[in-house]
Amino acid sequence: MLAKRIIPCLDVTGGRVVKGVNFLELRDAGDPVEIAARYNGQGADELTFLDITATSDGRDLILPIIEAVASQVFIPLTVGGGVRTVEDVRRLLNAGADKTSFNSAAIANPEVIDAASAKYGAQCIVVAIDAKRRTPEEAARPGPDGAPRGEGWDVYSHGGRKNTGLDAVQWAAEMARRGAGEILLTSMDRDGTKSGFDLALTRAVSDAVSVPVIASGGVGGLDDLADGVQQGGADAVLAASIFHYGEYTVAQAKERMAARGIPVRL
């Protein structure tokens, strides 16, 4: 079994790392370059950098900050937020990113994943999916075939502001077919709540795709990370709050996972 990865996440807006609850109530967590260097030193397997307001603000990529972060880390760096085109992938790779993450742009134009993967390889194309469990009212609404949609999760775009009506599990499968090398799966219901991953969502997507799935949204303790792997079927686990505010270190997270029989790089 391959080692499971622990990935701290930097949600960035206005040049600062922030953390919210359910994608709202953002709280400052510090300077992205300093925080990235800290996680690099703690032994994180990878780092994810998400410009969380680039798409909703219609802004360009913040290349100077990305270059500064890339200069401080010697582990794979994934950058997302405002990635719209194959040309954006080139610009980010040149700025020091190892992988690029598409979200809203893939929803607007799914073919961009085919094109980016064909040009740069699936290994550097991540598709981020922000998913929210359907309300009973949403589940009762008819789907494309006229039957009630039923329980499940919908995909949201524009930083979690817009329900696309896409089914999260089906969307993940389509993105993998089109050439995504990895799925970054965030539960909006659990984001920042510290109540653990949405394991049913994680498992449903993990079972539907053959590419690695990164579980995100809801980590409150070290056992939540292990549960994401053992119960959710995730290949990697992403967390922010528990690391940013000093509750736990990456090393402690790896020790707990190893103690539960999960292979990690110590």
Curated annotation (Swiss-Prot):
GO terms for cellular component: cytoplasm. The active site is at 11, 130. It is found in: Cytoplasm. Its EC number is 4.3.2.10. Keywords: Amino-acid biosynthesis, Cytoplasm, Histidine biosynthesis, Lyase. This is Imidazole glycerol phosphate synthase subunit HisF. One of its GO terms (molecular function) is imidazoleglycerol-phosphate synthase activity. The keyword Amino-acid biosynthesis applies. The gene is hisF. SUPFAM superfamilies: Ribulose-phoshate binding barrel. It comes from Paracidovorax citrulli (strain AAC00-1) (Acidovorax citrulli).
